[in-house]
Amino acid sequence: MPWAVGRRWAWITLFLTIVAVLIQAVWLWLGTQSFVFQREEIAQLARQYAGLDHELAFSRLIVELRRLHPGHVLPDEELQWVFVNAGGWMGAMCLLHASLSEYVLLFGTALGSHGHSGRYWAEISDTIISGTFHQWREGTTKSEVYYPGETVVHGPGEATAVEWGPNTWMVEYGRGVIPSTLAFALSDTIFSTQDFLTLFYTLRAYARGLRLELTTYLFGQDP
């Protein structure tokens, strides 16, 4: 009936309006945030260690980040490599810093993997330490290959196909609505692998990052 169709369109219009307002509110909120890290800062630090053994590179990077940003990088006893299954690919990550609007982590795969990048309310950049990163951008018919020392930027709302060769490791920085990225990052873990221990490890790492940021905000950091 005509009135039913009209009512349906009214609900659709209301839903789209709410989504638009929510998106605008989110970006206004991000515009008011003061960020701890900068994308180019992380990329430049990572480039210094590109080509080294990835474990050596990561250990040196962590030391430097703690020197530059005391109180914002998790202590050694809380660093943990955790599997990530998302978008059909499998890798591992070690979270160094996390807040509601930023994160810094180490990421990679020992075996190689490929799949969907995901779409995020965040900008994500990866600077490669070792291996290769293949990216096929939406709307194109050719892929691009990135090598150690190069940075791959994934903009908000973008989607790509990604492939990492064996022993590919990188430093990743994300800025945006970070909790929104967890839905994609945990989807395969919940609905496919059902590896709930990994789910616990991931949520615990993020909670530790939030706790550290709250502690530093409330009590400061000893020089």
From Swiss-Prot:
Pfam family, one: ERG2_Sigma1R
InterPro entries, alphabetized: ERG2_sigma1_rcpt-like
GO BP term, pick one: regulation of postsynapse assembly
Highest taxon listed in the record's lineage: Eukaryota
Tissue note: Expressed in ependymocytes and neurons throughout the CNS from the olfactory bulb to the spinal cord. Expressed by progenitor, mature and satellite oligodendrocytes and by Schwann cells (at protein level). Expressed in liver, intestine, kidney, brain, lung and heart. Expressed by retinal cells.
Residue segments, region Important for ligand-binding: 99-106
Site note Important for ligand binding, residues: 126, 172
Region (C-terminal hydrophobic region): 177-223
Stretches for region Targeting to endoplasmic reticulum-associated lipid droplets: 2-8
UniProt keyword list: Cell junction, Cell membrane, Cell projection, Cytoplasmic vesicle, Endoplasmic reticulum, Lipid droplet, Lipid transport, Membrane, Nucleus, Postsynaptic cell membrane, Receptor, Synapse, Transmembrane, Transmembrane helix, Transport
One GO CC term, this protein: postsynaptic density membrane
A GO term, aspect molecular function: signaling receptor activity
Subcellular location as annotated: Nucleus inner membrane; Nucleus outer membrane; Nucleus envelope; Cytoplasmic vesicle
Topological domains, Cytoplasmic: 31-223
More details: Depletion by RNAi alters oligodendrocyte differentiation and enhances opioid analgesia.
Entry protein name: Sigma non-opioid intracellular receptor 1
Gene: Sigmar1
